[in-house]
């Protein structure tokens, strides 16, 4: 298989973790006879400094002619006092909109070697393997009007707006994902209060008729936020609207014990997607070899799975990550029992060693 990838390293530790992910990707693709062309582009603060905008047209052109996007991280205090239109995060929001990325997938998986790093009790997190599917392009964050009004601007209004099509496509995506996992889907809303949530629930029920093998349940967002802490292992796939998903996915991120481990995918209706780690740009450790590359590496694995259907290669990367952690190798943000803290580059070297060793083993059963 041949693929063309847009590579957007971004700011802070973004270039370091992106280098790691590209090295791992090249290894697993070469081992299995696939070919990738990588084309770098600017986004965020780096783009502001060089091109005067967080999302240059050249970057959009590169992304449009690519099969998928890999992104490192955007932002940092250097640009905090810029006008709103010149903030690094505007580049990310603009890219999502321009590329039609409406579904954010946030996998949350507990690793045996990191259970003690979780703020939750070991027995509550050891079997956690869930995905939060968040709608990205509608809801309160994009509704109009959104303004201050009245005398002295002492009244404020934000608008929560969704179309039927926007709700249908995100719920459809969640059912498709649940169907290839454990066939359980929790649709999260606030249907006891919000009209938008009542429509959301109606559409979920309509869509469920097409997926009789998937068990659909409805949960209120306040109950879900409690259950994510009390019993996270009950969840398989969670689907929800934009703001609820923003909050719940950040809450769920603490389960693993490190933001540095978490990948994410932003998808549209076809196989195209943008893949990035959940963590920020961490400018305080940029260039010091301390950055944890695993969230970006695991994001690359998601890319192979969802954009290219390369399940075997994606699983190989995920197994290499697990094996390296089992061997005790980690960066400083990870609390691995009897762990050996190594640099970004050395941790990447260990991953590549695992992948090459696995590829070199004779395959008795084909």
From Swiss-Prot:
Keywords: Amino-acid biosynthesis, Branched-chain amino acid biosynthesis, Cytoplasm, Leucine biosynthesis, Magnesium, Manganese, Metal-binding, NAD, Oxidoreductase. This is 3-isopropylmalate dehydrogenase. HAMAP family: LeuB_type1 (MF_01033). One of its GO terms (cellular component) is cytosol. GO terms for biological process: L-leucine biosynthetic process. The record marks 141, 190 as: Important for catalysis. Its EC number is 1.1.1.85. Homodimer. Its cofactor is Mg(2+); Mn(2+). It catalyses: (2R,3S)-3-isopropylmalate + NAD(+) = 4-methyl-2-oxopentanoate + CO2 + NADH. Gene3D superfamilies: Isopropylmalate Dehydrogenase. The gene is leuB. Pfam families: Iso_dh. It comes from Heyndrickxia coagulans (Weizmannia coagulans). Substrate binds at residues 96, 106, 134, 222. The keyword Cytoplasm applies. Belongs to the isocitrate and isopropylmalate dehydrogenases family. LeuB type 1 subfamily. The keyword RNA-binding does not apply. NAD(+) binds at residues 76-89, 280-292. Catalyzes the oxidation of 3-carboxy-2-hydroxy-4-methylpentanoate (3-isopropylmalate) to 3-carboxy-4-methyl-2-oxopentanoate. The product decarboxylates to 4-methyl-2 oxopentanoate.
């Amino acid at each position: 298989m041949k693929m063309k990838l847009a590579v957007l390293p971004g700011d802070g530790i973004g270039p370091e973790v992106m280098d790691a992910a590209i090295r791992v990707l090249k290894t697993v693709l070469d081992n299995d006879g696939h070919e990738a062309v990588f084309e770098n582009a600017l986004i965020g603060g780096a783009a502001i400094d060089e091109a005067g905008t967080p999302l240059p047209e050249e970057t959009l052109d590169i992304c449009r002619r690519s099969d998928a996007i890999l992104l490192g991280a955007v932002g940092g205090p250097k640009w905090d006092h810029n006008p709103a239109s010149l903030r690094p995060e505007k580049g990310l929001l603009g890219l999502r909109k321009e590329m039609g990325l409406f579904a954010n997938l946030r996998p949350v998986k507990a690793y045996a070697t990191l259970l003690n790093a979780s703020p939750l009790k070991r027995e509550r997190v050891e079997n956690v393997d869930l995905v939060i599917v968040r709608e990205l392009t509608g809801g309160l964050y994009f509704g109009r009007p959104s303004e201050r009004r009245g005398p002295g601007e002492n009244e404020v209004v934000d608008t929560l707006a969704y179309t039927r099509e926007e709700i249908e496509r995100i719920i459809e995506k969640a059912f498709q994902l649940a169907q290839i996992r454990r066939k359980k889907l929790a649709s999260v809303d606030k249907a006891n209060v919000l009209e938008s949530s009542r429509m959301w629930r109606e559409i979920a029920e309509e869509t469920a008729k097409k997926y009789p093998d998937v068990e659909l349940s409805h949960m209120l967002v306040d109950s879900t936020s409690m259950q994510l802490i009390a019993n996270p292992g009950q969840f398989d796939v969670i689907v929800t609207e934009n703001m609820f998903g923003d909050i719940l996915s950040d809450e769920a991120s603490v389960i693993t014990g490190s933001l540095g481990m978490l990948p994410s995918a932003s998808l549209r209706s076809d196989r195209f997607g943008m893949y990035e780690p959940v963590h920020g740009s961490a400018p305080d450790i940029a260039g010091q070899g301390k950055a944890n590359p695993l969230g970006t590496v695991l994001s690359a694995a998601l890319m192979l799975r969802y954009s290219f259907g390369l399940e075997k290669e994606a699983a190989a990367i995920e197994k290499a990550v697990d094996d390296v952690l089992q061997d005790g190798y980690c960066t400083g943000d990870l609390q691995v029992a009897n762990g050996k803290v190594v640099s970004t580059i050395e941790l990447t070297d260990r991953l590549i060693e695992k992948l090459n060793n696995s590829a070199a083993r004779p395959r008795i059963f084909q």
